[in-house]
Structures are given as C-alpha cells and as structure tokens.
Amino acid sequence: MQINISRFGILFIALIWLVPSMSMAQQLDPILKELISKGLDKSHRINVHDLDTEQAKVDQSLAKAVLLPKVTFNGSFTRLDDDITFDDDTQNLLIATQKLLIKEAVGIPFNDPFPGNIPLTEVANLQDQNILKSSVDLDWVLFSGLEVTNAIRASKHKEASLNYVGNAEKDKIALTIIETYDKLALVYASKRVLTTSENYLNEQEFYVKKAIENGLATPISRKKIELAQQQLASKALEFNHNKTVLIEVLHQLTGENRENLTLLHPQLQSLSTALVSNTEKRNEIRALEEAEKASLYKSKMEKSNFIPKLALKGHYEFIEDDLSLLDPKWFVGAGIKWNVFDGFQSHLKSKKSIIESQKYREQIEEAEEMIALSIIEAQLTYESSLQNTKIVQKEIDLASATYNMVDKQFKNNLASINDVLDALTDLEKAHFKLQESFFGQRRSIANLLHAKGILTAFYN
C-alpha cells in the first residue's frame, strides 16, 4: 500500500514544473546581464583587441604627423687641425687688390708705391679652427602624393575591422557565460527534482515501516526503499560536484566572487523570441569587409609612391662668429621629390595588397554561406526544441498518471514495491527531461540570435 498525494498537491507540483514553459516573453535575467558585463570587462582577449584598436588609432596619428612641420634645434662644437685659409697666391692677390682700392680712395696714383703708414686688413680665414654652432631646422612636407591620405583611410578601416572583431569576440564570451549560467540553472532544477523524489521516498518509507509493523509488508520492501534513497543521495552528491565546477567556471569567466556566485539560484526561463524575426549583418562579416577596404586603400597608398612630393626646408644659425665665409646665416627652400622608377617595388607591393583584398572577399562569401546555413540549422533546432518540450510535458502527464495508478494498486496489494519505485523513477526521469528540454530551448534561441547577428542587442 502507499500514502496518496492529494490532487491539489499533484496540480501544484505540475504548475511548478510548467512555470518555465510559460515564460516565453521573459527577457534575459538582469543578474546574467551583469555577469556578462563583468565577463566582458575581465576578458583578456577583448582587452587585447582593444589594445590592437588603440594601435590602429596611433597609426592614424602617425600618418597625419607626416604633414606636420618638424622643428629641430642643433648644437655642436668642432676643433679642426688648423684654420682653413686661402693659398698664398690668393692671399697676395687679395692684399694687392686691397692696396689698389685704398690708393684709389685716397687719390694716390696707380704707379706710386703704397704708403707704409696705412694699415692693411688681414685676409680672413675661410674657417676658423674652433667652430661653435647653434641652429634650428624646419622640415615640412606640404604634399605627400596622397600617401598620407590613403594611409589614414586604410588605418581607419583597420580600426573598424578590429572593433568588429572585438564585438564578435564579445558575443562568443556572452554565449559561453549564458551557457554556463544555464547549466547552473539546470543543476538547480535537477536538485528540485531530487527533492521531489526524496519527498516521495520519505512517504513510501513511512508507509512501509507501518506496513511491516502490521505484518502487511516484508523487510525486503524497506531495504529497497533504502537502496533507492542511497541512489538518490548519490545523485545529490553529483549535484554538489556539478554546482562547484560551474561556479568555478563562472568565477573564471567573470571574476565574480565565489561566495556571491554560490548565492545564485538561476531559473531555466525561456528567452524572449521578440528579436528572432530580425536579421543583421554579423560582426565577423563587417570585420572582413572593413579589412578588405583597408587592403584596397593600402594598395592605393603604395601606388601613390609615383606621385611627386613637395616639401619645405628652412635653416637659421643663432651664432654667426664661427660661420665660414661660405656658410649662410639662414635659408628657406622648397623641393620636389619624384620617384620615377623604383625597380617595380611599389607596383609589386600594390599588387600584393590587392591580392590580400581578394582573399578577404573570398572569406566574406564563404562566411556568408556558412552563416546562412547556421541560421537554418538554428531555426530548425529551435522549432525542434519547442516540439520536444511539448512531448516531454506529455511524458510527465503519463508518468504522473502511471505513478498514481501503481500507487493505488500497491495500496490494494495489486502491485509490488518494485513497481512503485519504477514508476517513481520514470516520473523523475520525465522531470529531468523537461528541464533538459528547457535548457536546450534556451541554447537554441541564443544560438539563433547569434546566427542572425542580433545577440549583442539581447544582452546589452
């Protein structure tokens, strides 16, 4: 015989198990959103992508800096082995010329000797032995032949590509955290199933004990109950192990304190399907498209090597005393550099970049085909999960009805304790299958959102 559970109790238990299936409009758990946010902040891979993006921004600044004027201050001291002077003939010529100019200035006839009382200026050195210089230089590229413009555009597209790669990585991390969180919810749901089974067994144990006292059952029945309880305890131990492992995984993914994660009691509520009808371009496709554009602009940059470049040069000396007779104090000049032939290097580099862009185009087309297939597979998996949930709910109804029937038969000595335990096991398995079905349903929706490129909007 068996103690019966009231119809109200059975209805209450059934409602508890059906709650998740009624939650199709539920949004993502706020706690799960917070864990995803912490996981994204902690991820080393995302941090590396962010640093790559910063490097791309620095590359843009470097390209822009080419067109900025460069100012350089210079200072030096040099000691020569001797003064640099004119040769003797040139010095004699300069002295004679000086005498002629003086004679003309004072009115002395050309053929008269030069007066000895008039001092002459010594011929200056071309360069003194000790040279102290201090100067400033200005170098300014006025036109780079479009190299800078194309380099900046290529770098901007590279930055955009890296941003999309980072977003794709965020989606993968979010999927991993959602799956781990759902596994933890499945473990807790399994615990609730075990608790229900434990209550059934406790009631059976109470009845069998009374039945043995009244001679209506044998001790074998009690031993079978005890064996079932031990098996249940083993499952409970497995639950604790799984819970510990999943909490550790969440800790590693999010950096959240283990004690706080232990306090979580997630529920397997179905995710919202409101966004499933939308489809957006995946971050992976956007990243490849931006990389393709970056390669094309890189090709243009390398081609522009043949366009003339225009630059301005300026120089100013602060110290004049040690300048040679040939050194200017300052100068300003403009120049053109035209690379007419470089041994086909620019052409080959440009061709290499074009081939790189063609590789990206092939990857884009392949990715689009794979994504289209993944959307179909995810959609079919989602529809299958919905159907599977309905089937499992029918199995629960059947297992529950069977258990009630066997309970009545056992009460009237028409069934053995083995039949009761088998019926209870079937009911327990059906409840487990329902929770696994809810888990699979959430997985299929998350994968469908990811395949359609709208997962980011779901967890942000």
Question: What annotation goes with each model-predicted range?
Answer:
Residues 24, 32-33, 72-74, 79-98, ...:
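Acidic, low-complexity, intrinsically disordered peripheral segments
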Residues 2, 33-34, 58-60, 164-281, ...:
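Periplasmic alpha-helical coiled-coil/stalk elements that build and connect Gram-negative outer-membrane
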